[in-house]
Amino acid sequence: MTTTIPLKEAVVVILDIGLGMTSKDSDGTTTTTSSIEDALRSVTLLYQQKLIYGKKDQLGLVLIGTKGTKNNLQDDGYQHITVVSDIEEPSIETLKYLENLAPGESKGDVIDSLIVAMDMLIRKTENKKYQKRIFLVTNARDPINTEDLSIVRDQFKKIDVKLNIIGVDFLEEIEENNMDTSNNNKNKSLKEKNEIFLREFAESVDGVLVPVKQALEMMSFFRSQSVMTRTSFRGALEITPELKIPVWGYLKMKQQLLPSLKKISSIAQQQIEQQQQQQQQQNKNKNNEDNEDNEEGKPNITLDVNQEVSYYSITDPDNEILKPDLLKGYKYGKSLIPFSKIDEDQLKYSSSKCLKVVGFTDRKSIPIYYNMGNTEVFVSQPGDKQSEEALSSFIHALVETDQVMVVRYVKTMNGSPYLGYMIPHVKSDYVCLYYNHLPLADDIRQYQFPPISPKNPLTRKSNIPNAEQLEATQQLIDSMDLMKSEFDEDGDPIQMLKPRFTYNPLLQHFYQCLHHRSLHPNTQIPKLDPIIAEYINPDQIIMNKSKQSIKNFADKFPLTKTTVFSKTPAISGGNTNGTTSNTNNTMIGGVKYHWKDGMLIGEEINLDSYVTDDGSEAKKRKVNDFSEFSLDKLVSGYVTEVGTINPVQNFKDMLNRRDMDLVDKAITLMKERILQLVNDSLRDQYYQKAFECIKELRVGCIRESEAEQFNGFLKDMRSLFQSKKRDDFWQYITADVTSILGEKSINLITQDECDSSEVTQEELDQFLDKKVKQFNPPPITNVNTDSVDDLFDQIE
């Protein structure tokens, strides 16, 4: 299986609008305006396809037969040729220009336009990787200068330019005896001579000439967007630790969604429209006869919008909450459980990239509904003969045994692991493995349906079809068989609705509407295209073929209309029939009906539970009054402990309490929590969290003028951890980590930072290098159970 990387394409479109597009032929007949209309439509469709599918392609537009001249070679005699747009990304402005384009007033030479187009391609693609192509759209009614033709041919081959000629009013085929210009040359018209010449020229440069009607049909067909072929995985397929096969993975199937909508400024749009109107008025005043673009008048206003989000508390809407002060909360019952960034990082599972075989199973043991997510295809590493042979033999063995392999798949380093399965696929020219995710028990929806199989003893007899019904069903299936609905030229059946040839009608209709809206912003969306309508409606060939089978099936399975119950509630007193209905059930005369196992079940309802003793009003369920509570009070207002889930926020909330003084308690609890995090940490698991707590404790002590409490605690930690079991934590918080974490090391609070501190700058500089005596830390309460109890306290 070979993979090709599509290159960017540089295209020059040459459109003939000269006098020949509307002139009289030599036989006296007058060509209709459909010639130039077909030419414009073909160029418009080409631009439209490039706008939709060719995201990286660039186009230029050249006109032949204009009254004026505008090109880089005009000083050398290339007259009546106008370059409307250089080779650039296609734009809506070019489409609008084409829509309002009028026929030219002069005659231009086709060969001269090809030379101008090649000059544009050379200037654009010099030292760049581009595929180069020229589209020439003409009816060949104007004279063509054939001098120096060999030089033009050589230049085409030298710069490797592909030529596509779209012939307006060209014959689909020309007989060989008519291709010779020497035969009956006098009897041929100028158009016939030019048509023969262009066919020969296109063939000499390996180009293609297509009549305009055929070109319109091809460009009107649906097509899919070209995408860059990139590997999604490069690594080894590990069958055993001793057997590893290098493979490459590619994305094979992914749902194509509609393009995402972006918000734009309506105010800026109005300003652009005003500028465009002013520019049009200026062009009229200048009488711009050559249809040249005025670059100075183009709007310089952008429609893009920058979106900024601000957060405010419901109870304190005047103060903005900064993003660093926000954290995520997960709903657990009726409570919100806050999770800090550190907690989220701890929840993530880190794994190395791998594609490891877990085991093998029969292919029939994996139902079709187990396919999840996108499909990937795996092939052997290109150029590695040993891996090709090993993978090929392995795939053929899976096919012979009708088995698939279950694998553990981690696409990238530290990525999420997936359980999936790989199916072998063998073709005449390549072999590969297709991969899909396997669902877990949480992903599968289990539903209970009433049995309808004739072989099931629990099936009701009324649900078992008879022989005639089974025969009618089989005939209906056979008549609508997509494998036998169409036939090729040899009479062999062809499968209908192949996914590779069936395009999404929603996407196609969207792009047509998008194109229409870009050119006509104030008109209605166009009606559904007939070709798209064929996609969304049943195929007429199949429907005609199965018409009798559908009738027989309807006769064998007659449908009876069910009783339609009134939707007027009986308890409202407005319905004398005593019936009520809602979405899921129906009540008639005090009996509530609902569907169960395909049957309508009735259940008697006691209306006393719905009305008061006097029958005046329905009872209302009592609801607890939570008007005095708010989310802020729930998660912060009544905090009296520094927990393990979010100790930093708990500490802040306790310091901010105004109904009681909890400063001393908050500092004491924070000290205990820091020591607990360090002692309970598996290696450095909680070091960062403890580090954040120490930083916040230091800030809080400075704020509350409790510098001595922090300085004493820091000295106690040095005695406890330095040069001991947790010396790595002491080095973690006191090392110069500015270049790594962007944070300064933890140190004492000095007199310059807080008036209550007695630490001088000299003592600060000596502190981290000073050795101290052994210190016994204060006892930590509920070290083993505090985190669990604290979690339940938060939930309650």
From Swiss-Prot:
One of its GO terms (cellular component) is nucleus. Residues 272-285 have a biased composition (Low complexity). GO terms for biological process: DNA damage response; DNA recombination; double-strand break repair; double-strand break repair via nonhomologous end joining; sorocarp development; telomere maintenance. Its EC number is 3.6.4.-. Residues 10-205 form the VWFA domain. It comes from the Eukaryota. Belongs to the ku80 family. Single-stranded DNA-dependent ATP-dependent helicase that plays a key role in DNA non-homologous end joining (NHEJ). Heterodimer of ku70 and ku80. This is X-ray repair cross-complementing protein 5. It comes from Dictyostelium discoideum. The lineage of its organism: Eukaryota, Amoebozoa, Evosea, Eumycetozoa, Dictyostelia.
